[in-house]
Structures are given as C-alpha cells and as structure tokens.
Amino acid sequence: MARFLLATQATPTISATDANPRTLGDSVSNNKNIASMDTHMVIILAALLCALICALGINSVLRCVLRCTRRFTPNEDPVDTNANVAKGIKKRALKVIPVDSYSPELKMKATECLICLGDFVEGETVRVLPKCNHGFHVKCIDTWLLSHSSCPTCRQSLLEHQTPANGSRRGDDVAT
C-alpha cells in the first residue's frame, strides 16, 4: 500500500437530505452577511481615502495662496530687521567706519578675515566694525556691507534706527 506525504482524510460530505434545513439556511445567510460587511468595509475605506486626498489637495492650494499673497503684499513695517539686514548700507556710510593699519596691538577679536579666511599681515588695512569690534580686510567687508547691514561674524546690525522730529525713520546712518 502506497502512502502519500500530504494525504488528507476525506471529510464527509453533507448531502441536502442529511442536513438540517435550518443549518444550511444559516450558513448561506452568514455568507451573505460576511460579503455585505466586506462590501461596506471597502466603501468606507474608499471614502476615507478620497477624504484624505481632498484634504491634502486643499492644504496644498491654501499654502500656495498664502505664499502668493505674502509675495505681493507690501511690508507694513519699514524698519523690519530682516529687511534692513538684506538691504545693505550706502557707500557714504562706509566711509564713516574707521580703517586702521593692522598690528598685533590692535584690539581685534580675530587674527584673520572671516570673509576670505586670509590672515592679517602687519601693515595691511583693515576695517574694524564699531559695535562688535570685529575686523576684516577693507575690500572684503566693503563688498559685504553693500549688500548686508550686519556684521558677517555676529550678525549685529550696524544701522541706527533714529526717529527724527518729522516722525519718519531712517536706517542709513552707521553707528559709531
């Protein structure tokens, strides 16, 4: 007699005449309930997926609208610190900042220019910023200050915000 590895025992089949009619009806109705529950679950998951996609779409549209409206609205505060840092200072204001000849006795916080990373050589002209006492090569710091109004090392603003008698604000004067 041959043996099969995955031999299964035959399950007795229930014929319609042997089975209780109530049991067959219950199993058919259970199958219908399970099928309708699966259908309802698929519909609910599809609705949730659609709601998520709609929410993400609305979020993207709102972010785009807010970004565009910020771009076109004028800045209400003319003395905004970020605007002043990006604005730079005028050439005539650069002349107010003192230029010295570098020597080891000069009271500067560093011995190299942090813009070009070059060491200071004795006798070289350097510009020392008045508020923070950081020193830089004249060409390096002048180029920087034409487009920025702060120290490149500590970001301290070099502009004085004075309110003249007429009430308008000026930010072109360099602190000395």
Swiss-Prot record:
Per the record, the zinc finger regions (RING-type) lie at 113-155
Query: What pairs make up the disulfide bonds?
Result: none
CDD domains per the record?
Answer: RING-H2_EL5-like
Q: Which keywords are on file for this protein?
A: Membrane, Metal-binding, Signal, Transferase, Transmembrane, Transmembrane helix, Ubl conjugation pathway, Zinc, Zinc-finger
How this chain sits in the membrane, per its record, is:
Single-pass membrane protein
- Record's subcellular location: Membrane
Task: Copy the pathway line from the protein's UniProt record.
Answer: Protein modification; protein ubiquitination
Q: Which GO terms describe its molecular function?
A: ubiquitin-protein transferase activity; zinc ion binding
- Please give the Gene3D superfamilies that the UniProt record associates with this protein: Zinc/RING finger domain, C3HC4 (zinc finger)
Q: What is its main location?
A: membrane
| Name listed for the protein in its UniProt record | RING-H2 finger protein ATL73
UniProt source species: Arabidopsis thaliana
The UniProt gene name for this protein comes to: ATL73
